[in-house]
A protein has these predicted regions:
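Active-site/ligand-binding surface loops and adjacent short beta/alpha elements
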Residues: 1-28, 33
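Active-site pocket scaffolds in enzymes
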Residues: 20-124
Length: 124
């Protein structure tokens, strides 16, 4: 499992994507880093099986104790609910995939200017 710190716009918007250039396809997951500050990526590359998971989340895979020690455990009171916003998009046009890469590059450049560096978005 990889834990990413995605670069985000001023409003918290960010995305992760998986691109298959051979097939000319991309899957984009857009979300708010304010609502879901963690992004986990996991892979299974066993023979005959290739799976990748992109999981925006409000806590990491480190567990409750880790977040309690850090003071950032996400609490949800009894009977409460929350709404999170995610958008999934499939791209199948070369120009759309190129635009996605430009969007990634712009977001990373902006984040580096603001905070002096940013982790890679999950996109080659």
């Amino acid at each position: 499992v990889y834990i990413h710190a995605p670069a985000a716009a001023d409003d918290g918007s960010t995305f992760a994507a998986v691109v298959n250039d051979e097939l000319g396809l991309a899957l984009v997951v857009e979300f708010s880093a304010r609502e879901l500050p963690y992004l986990m990526e996991w892979k299974s590359m066993a023979s005959g099986d290739y799976v990748v998971g992109l999981e925006p989340a409000n806590s990491s895979v480190h567990g409750r104790g880790y977040h309690e020690q850090r003071g950032d455990l996400h609490h949800l009171p009894a009977q409460a609910s929350e709404t999170k916003h995610l958008r999934f998009t499939v791209l199948n046009a070369p120009e759309d995939i190129s635009a996605l890469r430009r969007r990634r590059d712009d977001l990373l450049a902006s984040a580096r200017r603001v905070r002096g560096g940013a982790d890679r978005l999950a996109l080659p």
